[in-house]
A protein has these predicted regions:
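Extended hydrophobic leader/signal-anchor segments used for secretion and membrane insertion
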Residues: 1-149
Length: 149
């Protein structure tokens, strides 16, 4: 047994790092330019998998329709979204005369959009506009942009 003791530390270290990245931390690559200029395409994003309550303005990583995406939460349960389908503009909890749809965010759901409004497929255009809490993988705690040049 003593001759295998040197293996114990690397195995424990590997298991600890694996557990950390599968239960607490998320590290991924931003797949599109929908969050520009805030987070450029190809940036490394670091997230916290221990998601508590989400609020307006939080940037989240989630799985939706088989894809891992990054968007900003703009409406939480109970909020009302006034959406203009003609130009994609919206307001939250503030009535607007141009609204073509009025949506109330259900419990355990969120309305999310990309910061690059003209370059984002998000809650404004999805058939079901609401992202469920179960689809959320992590809340962003930072991003590290990499130039594509």
């Amino acid at each position: 047994m003593k001759k295998y003791r040197w293996l114990l530390m690397p195995i424990l270290l590997f298991c600890s790092v694996w557990l950390l990245f599968h239960t607490v931390l998320f590290v991924g690559v931003v797949p599109s330019s929908s969050m520009e200029p805030t987070i450029p395409e190809g940036s490394i994003i670091l997230g916290n998998r221990l998601v508590g309550s989400l609020g307006q303005g939080d940037i989240i990583v989630f799985r939706h329709e088989g894809k891992t995406l990054v968007k900003r939460v703009v409406a939480v349960p109970g909020d009302t979204v006034y959406l203009d389908d003609l130009d994609g503009s919206f307001t939250v909890n503030r009535e607007t005369p141009n609204a073509t749809r009025i949506l109330t965010v259900p419990e355990n759901c969120f309305f999310v959009v990309g910061d690059s409004r003209d370059n984002s497929l998000d809650s404004r255009v999805w058939e079901n506009p609401f992202l469920t809490a179960d689809e959320v993988i992590a809340v962003s705690v930072g991003a590290f942009p990499f130039a594509s040049e």
